[in-house]
């Protein structure tokens, strides 16, 4: 029997909160002023390498919504697509503003090696949006974007630190201002779509797996920022034990339990 929309969203938040954005060393280090300006620029090169794939995976979500005749989802998909890619400047263009201020050209950024975490994130996000339904693609992004946006969200706090402590110009840090303004709406609309459309057992399971994929993928991306800054292959473990549904051996199917004992 499917969960109620409220109970299902609450369950999905428990997945996202295993690796909360605000606690990841990339964001926390900026907010608490533990990284140097030079390290942040190296991390932002990795950010750029992932963001330049936005048109690819948003395109897959849009195409899937049309091919699936998911008319109710199309408005959400197109709103997000236009905010990300429409207008005179895309998010990729805005990302480049910080790199340009640091003396890094687009050609130099394009030639940079992706860190292990960055590579994993790109493959997981692009592949996930290509091979899964439009609803699953939105779910993959939703709980990360919802944490990013808003006046008290991660992006707003990072923006204040970049401007106030590190001395980046508003133009250089603009990508975080835009995330603060737009991502709360993106995430909220996507979560509302999950409430509306994920109403069967099978759809809820697909969305559950997509959210897990997205949470892991973006966590890998931020690991990639830190890997590029430090030169160390490290993976952030999150704030608690890894919760996985695993067989119990009692013949009753999988149950949710910690992987650590």
Could you describe each region identified by the protein language model?
Residues 1-261:
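Non-heme di-metal
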């Amino acid at each position: 029997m499917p969960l109620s929309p409220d109970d299902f969203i609450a369950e999905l938040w428990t997945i996202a909160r295993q690796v909360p954005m605000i606690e990841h060393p990339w964001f926390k280090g900026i907010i608490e002023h533990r990284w140097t300006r030079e390290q942040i620029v190296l991390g932002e090169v990795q950010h750029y390498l992932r963001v330049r794939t936005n048109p690819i995976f948003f395109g897959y979500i849009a195409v899937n919504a049309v091919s699936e005749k998911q008319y109710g989802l199309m408005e959400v998909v197109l709103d997000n697509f236009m905010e990300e890619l429409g207008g005179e400047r895309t998010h990729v263009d805005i990302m480049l503003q910080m790199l340009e201020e640091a003396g890094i050209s687009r050609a130099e950024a394009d030639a940079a090696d992706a860190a292990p975490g960055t590579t994993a994130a790109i493959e997981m996000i692009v592949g996930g949006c290509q091979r899964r339904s439009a609803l699953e693609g939105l779910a993959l992004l939703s709980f990360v974007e919802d944490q990013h946006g808003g006046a008290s969200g991660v992006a707003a706090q990072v923006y204040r630190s970049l401007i106030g402590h590190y001395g980046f110009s508003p133009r250089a840090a603009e990508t975080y201002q835009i995330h603060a303004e737009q991502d709360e709406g993106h995430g909220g609309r996507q979560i509302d779509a999950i409430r509306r459309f994920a109403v069967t057992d099978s759809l809820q399971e697909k969305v559950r797996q997509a959210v897990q994929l997205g949470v892991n993928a973006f966590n890998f991306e931020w690991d990639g920022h830190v890997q590029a800054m430090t030169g160390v292959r490290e993976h952030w473990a999150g704030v608690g034990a890894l919760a996985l549904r695993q067989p119990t051996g009692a013949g009753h199917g999988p149950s949710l339990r910690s992987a650590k004992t």
